Design a protein with these regions (language model features):
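The conserved beta-strand core of Leucine-Rich Repeat
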Residues: 1-223
Length: 223
């Protein structure tokens, strides 16, 4: 039964047919094993108009009974992130996706409670400052995979370039267990990149896109 339920996404699992079929199916839906991966992105179109993803997220976290290992958040997740931080001590993977609205204060409080975190993805989450990565480096010593995509601005259809800023690179260089790193639209320059490489001896995969302050000799970085 659990094998079948694993094939459903979170919204279908909680508010779809399985939870209403019979008592045994209802009980199975509440099994913590099914809630090790919680996804707030609301992929089930047929439920999006009637289901509060915020309520679903907190209920999913409750069902996980401390067993949640992976969490996907989108849009305003301040309350959900704090709720997760208090109830997911085993979390290993955190994804805050696409214009995710989370304050620096909330993120700082939450990240301190994820000491086992191995993967962090921040995609167009611009409400936290770069200093937060120093906190990540300290709070998550086992972090192995980091992806940070900035929401790059534009003016009259011309992409704006970021001024040189290596503060994020200096913090990332303290994440000594990193295996993969993806940085898009960052302000680091060659010196910042060198600092990361020197500080992350286990780095196996590096993906740096649209970081126009990095100059590769013999290559036009803007072309």
């Amino acid at each position: 039964m659990l094998y079948v339920l694993h094939k459903l996404d979170d919204v279908e699992l909680m508010f779809g047919g399985p939870a209403r079929v019979c008592r045994s199916w209802h009980d199975a839906v509440c099994e913590p094993e099914l809630w090790r991966r919680i996804d707030m992105r609301g992929r089930s179109l047929c439920f999006r108009e009637t289901v509060s993803l915020k309520n679903m997220a907190q209920l999913s976290i409750w069902f996980s009974a401390g067993q949640c290992r992976e969490f996907f958040g989108q849009h305003d997740v301040d309350n959900e992130l704090l709720f997760l931080a208090d109830r997911a001590p085993l979390l290993k993977s955190l994804h805050l996706i696409k214009h995710c609205d989370v304050s620096s204060e909330t993120f700082a409080k939450a990240i301190m409670k994820f000491p086992l975190l191995e993967e962090l993805e921040l995609w167009e989450c611009e409400t936290h400052d770069t200093g937060i990565f120093d906190l990540v480096a300290m709070a998550c010593p086992q972090l192995k995979h980091l992806k940070h995509v900035k929401d790059r601005g534009y003016s009259q259809y011309i992409w704006l370039e970021y001024p040189t800023d290596n503060s994020e690179a200096l913090a990332i260089a303290k994440m000594h267990e990193l295996r993969s790193l993806k940085l898009f639209h960052g302000g680091l320059d060659n010196q910042g990149l060198t600092t990361i490489i020197d500080g992350c001896p286990h780095l196996e995969y590096l993906d740096i896109r649209y970081c126009n302050n990095i100059i590769i000799v013999g290559v036009n970085s803007h072309g």
